[in-house]
Each structure stands twice: as structure tokens, then as C-alpha cells.
Amino acid sequence: MKKKEIVDDVTMKRAITRITYEIIERNKSLDNLVLAGIKTRGVYLARRIQERLKQLEGIELPIGELDIKPFRDDMKVEEDTTDMPFDINGKDVILVDDVLYTGRTIRAAIDNLVSLGRPARVGLAVLVDRGHRELPIRADYVGKNIPTSSIEEIVVEVIEVDGKDCVSIVDPS
């Protein structure tokens, strides 16, 4: 198994800043905007976007945490640890995740989101888009496009969970 770091902590910070600027530019008003991080690493990325928005615009967006496990089509988990401490009805929700691959995680996140209410609009921000979609889903905000083969894996590490910030490609062969 070969592991190669392709994004270091500085580059990751820049990618998150780029996503944050794109969110500012593409949304006429941030007043109706909320962030929903997809557990686990998407939550930490959403918090970083929230912090950058606070630094750049002086606004603190509400942030929630989506647990997609109970909504997956490939596993059966009953417990839902979603924490959405605000009403999403009529809100512009930006889902935040670490990697966009087949689209199945995002489908499950949308299923969870609409079970909580009816947002006005749903967008998607991802740190890495690696391609290989199985569902018609695309990200509105992308930190890095990293094409991979179908056997390779993208591993995102965040300091809050893993002790460092980086993105690596793992080749299992």
C-alpha cells in the first residue's frame, strides 16, 4: 500500500479560504445562510469555513452536524446523532464534506436534511472532488479537484481528529 501526501496544511488552509470567498461571492446575502457539516470531518471543515466567514465578513453563521449513517442505502444504523440546533425551513443550507466521490454520502445527507425541514436551497462545499460519480450530484464549492483511479482512495486528515491537516492518495496495490 502506497500513501502519498498531495495537500499539506498550508494548501488545505488556502483551499478552505477559497471556498469561503466563493460562498461570499455567490450569495447575495449571508443572512439566510447556514452550514451543515457531514460527520465527521465535514463538521470540522464547516467550523473552519464558519471561522473564516467571521474573520472576513464579521458574521457568525449557524452550524449544524448531519449524521448520514441512518440514511445510507448500504448499512443499517438506527441511532441518528444529527445535531441541527436551528430551524432549516426556508434557509439556504450549504452541506460541507471532506471528499466528493460517488455522491451516495451527499444523497444520504440530503435525505437527512429534508427529514428535518424544507430548506429554500441546498448547496454543497467539499474540500476534495475526486470524480467517479454514481449519482447526478456536483459540488458548488470545491477546494481541490483531484482526479483518481477507482482503486485509489483519498484520505483527508484534520488536526482535530488526526493530529495534522493533509490530504493523501492511497494506492492499495
Swiss-Prot record:
EC numbers, comma separated: 2.4.2.9
User: A GO biological process this protein is involved in?
Assistant: DNA-templated transcription termination
Coiled coil ranges: none
| Top EC category | transferase
User: Which positions does the motif PRPP-binding occupy?
Assistant: 93-105
Q: Which SUPFAM superfamilies does the record match to this protein?
A: PRTase-like
State one Pfam family annotation.
Answer: Pribosyltran
**Reaction it catalyzes:** UMP + diphosphate = 5-phospho-alpha-D-ribose 1-diphosphate + uracil
Q: Does the keyword Transcription regulation apply?
A: yes
Does Nucleotide-binding show up as a keyword for this record?
A: no
Q: Which InterPro entries match?
A: PRibTrfase_dom, PRTase-like, PyrR, PyrR_bifunctional
The entry's keywords: Glycosyltransferase, RNA-binding, Transcription, Transcription regulation, Transcription termination, Transferase
Q: Name one GO molecular function term.
A: uracil phosphoribosyltransferase activity
Family indicated by similarity: Belongs to the purine/pyrimidine phosphoribosyltransferase family. PyrR subfamily.
Purpose of the protein: Regulates transcriptional attenuation of the pyrimidine nucleotide (pyr) operon by binding in a uridine-dependent manner to specific sites on pyr mRNA. This disrupts an antiterminator hairpin in the RNA and favors formation of a downstream transcription terminator, leading to a reduced expression of downstream genes.
HAMAP family with a match to the protein in the record: PyrR (MF_01219)
Q: What quaternary arrangement does the UniProt entry report?
A: Homodimer and homohexamer; in equilibrium.
Q: What is this protein called?
A: Bifunctional protein PyrR
